[in-house]
Amino acid sequence: MANPPHGGVLKDLLARDAPRHDELEIEAEQLPAIVLTERQLCDLELIMNGGFSPLEGFMNQKDYDSVCENVRLADGNLFSMPITLDVSQAVIDDGKLKPGSRVTLRDFRDDRNLAILTIDDIYRPDKAKEAKLVFGGDEEHPAIKYLYNKVQEFYVGGKIEAINKLNHYDYVALRYTPAELRVHFDKLGWNRVVAFQTRNPMHRAHRELTVRAARARQANVLIHPVVGLTKPGDIDHFTRVRAYQALLPRYPNGMAVLGLLGLAMRMGGPREAIWHAIIRKNHGATHFIVGRDHAGPGKNSKGQEFYGPYDAQHAVEKYREELGIEVVEFQQVTYLPDTDEYKPKDEVPAGVKTLDISGTELRNRLRTGAPIPEWFSYPEVVKILRESSPPRHTQGFTIFLTGYMNSGKDAIARALQVTLNQQGGRSVSLLLGDTVRHELSSELGFSREDRHTNIQRIAFVAGELTRAGAAVIASPIAPYEESRNAARDAVTQAGGNFFLVHVATPLEYCEKTDKRGIYAKARRGEIKGFTGVDDPYETPSKADLTVDVSKQTVRSIVHEIILMLETEGFFDRS
């Protein structure tokens, strides 16, 4: 018998509302609609299939405040993460959304109607309170950045009626709903199930710790990786799922199953661990492995962890009775070469030789093509990871040149393009500032918002080209730190490599050598919003390379860039 769902009843809204499907579909076409973002889609899917039981919709203000302040819903049920539907001021100003009215929730990918929400209330969240109580308050936390920069001004709360499932085109057979997974466990005769959450590839150590956890509890294993939204920079879920599938035969026959979870993670540490436990309980698991720094976002700019290493374990243990799922504390295991086995570190006698490979070292080995030993990971898993992580010398990169107009950016960009073409090995694309303005951003002006949009477009193109293995050279003015950081994030999140080169040629030199007289026009007031004259240039705080045309030749600067790329391994050394 699978574990009872959180709150006692599995809120499978898709099954509940199926008899009214046609009626709801017709009504949905007559209602105003909210087109959901990717994160909202992930949340809606788990509301509709019961993964977020006992929720039946997006939280109203009463539930939102209670979850933030008390880690439970207004009715007293334990729940740790605000699940909210945010909308913009413009949507509110439109006047179509009011308490008591109904609104269609629509998929941005295919314009399908997914659900109808009956609005309970519309409220402006206290984002500072949410940031502090839910995520700890550090403004460098990715969830807090998302909250302040991406989440809209208002939340709409209310219960939903489900119309259609989300369409998925990848690994459909592995995307079990809670009800389907419970039926699967029952068919297999599983009564005790240890769930393992991961957003990373699994290696031999993970296999050992999950098998140990299952044996100690006479249980089976649910490998339940997140394939929704995870941490930027994580290995893509297509690669990870292939690796999980390759690993599965390494378990004793009949011990483990693989199921995928379309969750949008918040990287919320202790709060997220409680949330993950609730989700796994709803999927029928009786035990849940909580690791060291579970769902933590890593370190801030000062090198400090956002949470203590065992905060998540302590949080789940605190609510153990209410959760109704047994916490299995993640045991760090290490490899003993003399006996060819893995053991928990606290069980290894003093003086016994051990071996470990850190995540950083693994990434370096994948990047450089260095061998990865079989004691660490299985050959079939390594093969899959290598296919998705080609050697550095075959990867693409973006060189992003920033500086004043007439600082020498374009001359450097053109010379670098020629040099890289001569080098060979990858295609080279040039995105000059004026060219992009003419071809991609001709309708934009030079307000801060329009400048940011222009850089976003450059970054999107650069990210797509870089991901495909090209070398991209971009040379916009890009005067704002926020825009440059967003460009770096866009390229790296697309799977590319990004180098910011600050062309720090002094403004006086740029003006003095301006043969087109553009600075003179700006000084006379004929051009408004001109960088360096009546609009600021924010000096980059994290440039990978700083150069100056007033002190260096273009040739020497290009050579510096080439040396930087060579040092990073972007040219074949064989």
UniProtKB/Swiss-Prot annotation:
Q: Reaction catalysed?
A: sulfate + ATP + H(+) = adenosine 5'-phosphosulfate + diphosphate
Q: Where is this region: N-terminal?
A: 1-169
Q: Which top EC class is given? A: transferase
Q: Does the keyword Nucleotide-binding apply?
A: yes
**Chain segments carrying region Catalytic:** 170-394
Active site (record annotation): 198-200
Query: What CDD domains does this protein map onto?
Result: APSK, ATPS
UniProt GO cellular component terms: cytoplasm
Q: What is the lineage of its organism?
A: Eukaryota, Fungi, Dikarya, Ascomycota, Pezizomycotina
Q: What is its EC number?
A: 2.7.7.4
Record's protein name: Sulfate adenylyltransferase
Where does the entry annotate site (Induces change in substrate recognition on ATP binding)? 330
Any single Pfam family the record assigns to this protein: ATP-sulfurylase
